[in-house]
């Protein structure tokens, strides 16, 4: 839908910048997990969720 409004030059620029945007998005997500309570976020990941169960 967005490509309908963009010209061919900008379509090519967007295609070139998509991997960079994904990389920075991944870095931002890892930074968010690092800066916040990592356990709160990683409790939603299925494999890691079972690793840190407390035996009460």
UniProtKB/Swiss-Prot annotation:
Keywords linked to the UniProt accession: Electron transport, Membrane, Mitochondrion, Mitochondrion inner membrane, Respiratory chain, Transmembrane, Transmembrane helix, Transport
Localisation per UniProt entry: Mitochondrion inner membrane
Transmembrane segments: 13-35
Residue intervals annotated with topology Mitochondrial matrix: 1-12
Gene Ontology annotations for the cellular component aspect, listed alphabetically: mitochondrial inner membrane; mitochondrion; respiratory chain complex III
Source domain of life: Eukaryota
Mode of membrane association: Single-pass membrane protein
GO MF annotations in UniProt: electron transfer activity
Alphabetized InterPro entries for the sequence: Single_a-helix_sf, UQCR
Any Pfam family the entry gives: UCR_6-4kD
GO terms classed as biological process: cellular respiration; generation of precursor metabolites and energy; mitochondrial electron transport, ubiquinol to cytochrome c
Principal localisation: mitochondrion
Mitochondrial intermembrane domain ranges by topology: 36-56
Subunit composition and interactions: Component of the ubiquinol-cytochrome c oxidoreductase (cytochrome b-c1 complex, complex III, CIII), a multisubunit enzyme composed of 11 subunits. The complex is composed of 3 respiratory subunits cytochrome b, cytochrome c1 and Rieske protein UQCRFS1, 2 core protein subunits UQCRC1/QCR1 and UQCRC2/QCR2, and 6 low-molecular weight protein subunits UQCRH/QCR6, UQCRB/QCR7, UQCRQ/QCR8, UQCR10/QCR9, UQCR11/QCR10 and subunit 9, the cleavage product of Rieske protein UQCRFS1.
Function: Component of the ubiquinol-cytochrome c oxidoreductase, a multisubunit transmembrane complex that is part of the mitochondrial electron transport chain which drives oxidative phosphorylation.
Protein family membership: Belongs to the UQCR11/QCR10 family.
Protein name (database record): Cytochrome b-c1 complex subunit 10
Source organism of the structure: Homo sapiens
């Amino acid at each position: 839908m967005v490509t309908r409004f963009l010209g061919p030059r900008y379509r090519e620029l967007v295609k070139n910048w998509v991997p960079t945007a994904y990389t920075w998005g991944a870095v931002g997500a890892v930074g968010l997990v690092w800066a916040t309570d990592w356990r709160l976020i990683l409790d939603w990941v299925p494999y890691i969720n079972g690793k840190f169960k407390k035996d009460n």
